[in-house]
Amino acid sequence: FNAKFSSAYEVYESIYKQAKSSIYVVDNYIGLRTLVHLKKSPTGVNITLFSDNVGNNKLHNIEFTDFCKEYPTVNLSMKKTGGIFHDRFIVLDYGTADERVFLCGASSKDAGAGITSIVEDYGVSKYTPVIATLLKNPTLILPQ
């Protein structure tokens, strides 16, 4: 990240802290670690996780509920991706002049398990129709 090796926690935390109005995370493989990365997000920022919550070690409702109780200032919602995403990305401040997009090699739940890349993509306009479609998707219901 920023042309240097960093810990996954530092990278995610530094990206999320830059948000002014919203954070969108598109990642089909979410887990408790995904939520932990978001815990220091700025107060008042709306966070949406887009995921189909697939694979082993899925995020469960009890983990989500406990996280929300422990971090009540984190405004977090979830929507389905609809099974069409392989890549993972983060969108900060969608639809504003400050919009930024980051492409993430590894799933956020596995961040720190090995070397991966997170890069900023400066061609943000190509993501507008993708995010507009995702925002119309139904709410993700987590397993018990």
What are these regions (language model features)?
Residues I23:
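Catalytic histidine site
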